[in-house]
Amino acid sequence: MESDCQFLVAPPQPHMYYDTAAAAVDEAQFLRQMVAAADHHAAAAGRGGGDGDGGGGGGGGGERKRRFTEEQVRSLETTFHARRAKLEPREKAELARELGLQPRQVAIWFQNKRARWRSKQIEHDYAALRAQYDALHARVESLRQEKLALADQVDELRGKLNERQDQSGSCDGGGAEGDDDDKRNSVMNASSSGLVEEDYVSCLAVPVVDVSEDGSAACGGSSYEYDHHLDYLGGGQLPDPFCGMPDLWEIWPMVEWNAVA
């Protein structure tokens, strides 16, 4: 199994005491070694994995690095999806023994897989949030445009309403004057009709004149009251519309007047 792990680079050994600069240098060296090992592993994978087939060449050429088999990859994928958490050293050792790998191979594979999975998850979350942001931004812009359009409509309707109120105010002024004239005419007509009715009632209330033999007229009282009543009716004459009709006087029998004469 030692030949299978040639592409792996061990991390630097931890020290008990070292300063910050030394730690940074060690970390940089470790990263360069990891990058070089990854490049070497990718190149070996591109050329095709597996041990050298056929009897090529004496022991001079180095053995080709072997990749994980498909069965090993499937087992590792299944374990990773079932257990996203970090595996304990004992679990790593058992899984490595089942797959025929070293525990360090399993640990590094899980570490790389977890990093790629987190990166993809972050990209997925970012894409979802970006889509939501774009949708909200478009909605806000649409609402802003709709607000401006509604404000323009409100201004237009307010102007029309003011114009209509001005027109109705001018019309109401003329109409009020007309209404006052109509009311005045109605009052005058009512007054005149009331006077006519009062005259008619007064005419009907004139007592029957009793002409005595000596030519004096009695109205149920003195002649002064009768004359005063005639003066009230208009200069001692009966109202023309109802009591002053010539036809009625011509038809009225004047027996008593003739007898007196």
UniProtKB/Swiss-Prot annotation:
The keyword GTP-binding does not apply. Belongs to the HD-ZIP homeobox family. Class I subfamily. It comes from the Eukaryota. Keywords: DNA-binding, Homeobox, Nucleus, Transcription, Transcription regulation. It comes from Oryza sativa subsp. japonica (Rice). This is Homeobox-leucine zipper protein HOX24. Gene3D superfamilies: Homeodomain-like. Expressed in roots and panicles. The lineage of its organism: Eukaryota, Viridiplantae, Streptophyta, Embryophyta, Tracheophyta. CDD domains: homeodomain.
